[in-house]
């Protein structure tokens, strides 16, 4: 069994936001088409980060990855 020590993007995002003393993410999940889910996060600067996936978990993960990329770009 392979137990990866890497953190998932949702955990990384939460830890980075806590470190920067920013509000924790709130995910808004929708299912515009059967079998496809969308998740969005709105940042403190009112920027939207969208994720799509075949499950809510996948969509939230992609939204978190997009927000992380934005935050890392600012460093």
Language model: regions and residue ranges:
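Double-stranded RNA-binding/processing signature
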Residues: 1-75
């Amino acid at each position: 069994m392979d137990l990866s020590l890497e953190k998932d993007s949702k955990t990384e995002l939460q830890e980075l936001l806590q470190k920067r003393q920013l509000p924790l993410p709130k995910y808004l999940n929708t299912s515009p088409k059967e079998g496809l889910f969308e998740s969005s996060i709105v940042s403190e600067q009112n920027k939207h980060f969208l994720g799509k996936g075949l499950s809510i978990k996948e969509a939230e993960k992609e939204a978190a990855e997009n927000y992380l990329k934005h935050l890392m770009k600012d460093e």
